[in-house]
Design a protein with these regions (language model features):
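N-terminal, motif-rich segments that launch catalysis or mediate targeting to/interaction with membranes
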Residues: 20-152, 159-354
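Residue-level detector of transmembrane insertion/anchoring sites
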Residues: 7-8, 147
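Bacterial N-terminal signal peptides that target proteins for export
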Residues: 1-7
Length: 354
């Protein structure tokens, strides 16, 4: 198989940035799928009672990312109150189970008490009517719980938000057996793929040969780039946004709502879940671990290169070599995961409010 070698460049600010799973369009697509699937259901009425006039699952889907800064616009009093009450809210979006593993379980290496599985459990419990501290230690309100479920069901279907890469200095992917082994000396945390770098020009050139060209943007929707374009792209960023764009282009859709309409019309075959809905996050995490093995298939990291953050702190990054057809299987997997996320979001809300 042809290989694409991705060179390393200075990209510290990008490699060290916060992860926003699926990006704006991906999260909106998950919400839009659920909006359409829930029309006319008892759950739709319960959802409407918690949303503000004009809000939909699609429109609130990015709220938990927007509270991390002002890139969505000025923060509302509701956002500021949520951040003040949840100082570790950025940790709610992911878990870091070695991607080679098959299952998530409480206390596993890479898991945490505030990770995505535990946070989803709490939010689902709230909508089930449980408000005791054992079920809801963060004291989420029902509205916050709905917003978090809408967003985090999307996040947990992004493979790199569950399956994490741990790397030796020479670039080998390794499986730490304990948290203590991730010491930054023999075993490094690749930070959800943020410290694994693709050459942006090369991956773009490769995708141009196998992914349909983007449809012309609607008039007035183009925005200038917020930052100078980096010569490298973190693997996490590729999975957050780039593959979503590829997946939408392969379906000839331009907006999240068009994507939702197209995939629902195709009558996608989506695996269901069983048991109490509070156990479903474990099932989703296991499925995402399986997906992360596909995301890392054929991906090879080179030796570590030390860089320095804006705070003057040293850290390591690794240049990647990926299979030459990587945009094709990765965008196919992204399409599947977005569809599964939308259908599972609708299903869990129906299960809570039958």
């Amino acid at each position: 198989m042809k290989k694409l070698t991705c060179v390393l460049a200075l990209a510290g600010v990008f490699a060290a940035g916060n992860a926003l799973a699926w990006g704006n369009d991906g999260h909106r697509a998950v919400g839009a799928i659920a909006d359409q699937l829930l029309k006319g259901s008892a759950a739709q009425a319960k959802i409407a009672a918690l949303l503000l006039p004009g809000e939909t699952l699609e429109s609130i889907a990015n709220w938990p990312d927007c509270v991390k800064g002002t890139y969505c616009g000025p923060q509302s009093p509701e956002m500021l109150a949520y951040v003040a009450a949840n100082p570790r809210h950025s940790e709610y979006h992911y878990t870091d189970i070695p991607f080679q593993n098959a299952h998530y379980h409480d206390g596993a290496t890479g898991s945490a008490g505030d990770d995505i599985v535990q946070t989803l459990k709490q939010a689902i419990s709230v909508l089930q009517g449980k408000s005791d501290l054992a079920s809801n230690p963060h004291q989420f309100t029902p509205r916050q719980a709905l917003i978090l479920i809408t967003h985090l069901v999307g996040d947990i279907h992004q493979p790199l938000h569950v399956g994490a890469a741990y790397v030796a200095k020479d670039g080998r992917f390794v499986v730490p057996e304990t948290q203590a082994q991730i010491d930054g000396l023999a075993i490094f945390d690749a930070r959800g793929g943020n410290n694994l770098l693709l050459d942006d020009a090369q991956i773009t050139a490769l995708s141009d040969a196998v992914i349909p060209a983007p449809q012309p943007a609607e008039e007035g929707t183009l925005k200038p780039a917020a930052y100078p374009k980096s010569p490298t792209k973190p693997l996490h960023s590729y999975w957050d946004s780039t593959v979503v764009d590829y997946a939408m282009r392969r379906l000839s859709t331009r907006t999240p709502r068009q994507f939702a309409q197209t995939v629902i019309a195709s009558q996608s075959d989506v695996p269901g879940n069983s048991g109490d809905p509070v156990t479903w996050p474990y099932q989703w995490a296991d499925a995402s671990l399986a997906a992360s093995k596909v995301a890392y298939a054929g991906v090879v990291a080179g030796p570590a290169t030390q860089q320095t953050s804006r705070k003057g702190e040293p850290y390591y990054v690794w240049a990647l070599t990926v299979p030459g057809d990587y945009p094709v299987p990765s965008s196919s997997l992204a399409r599947t995961q977005l569809i599964n996320g939308g259908y599972h979001l609708a299903a869990v809300l129906r299960a809570i409010w039958p």
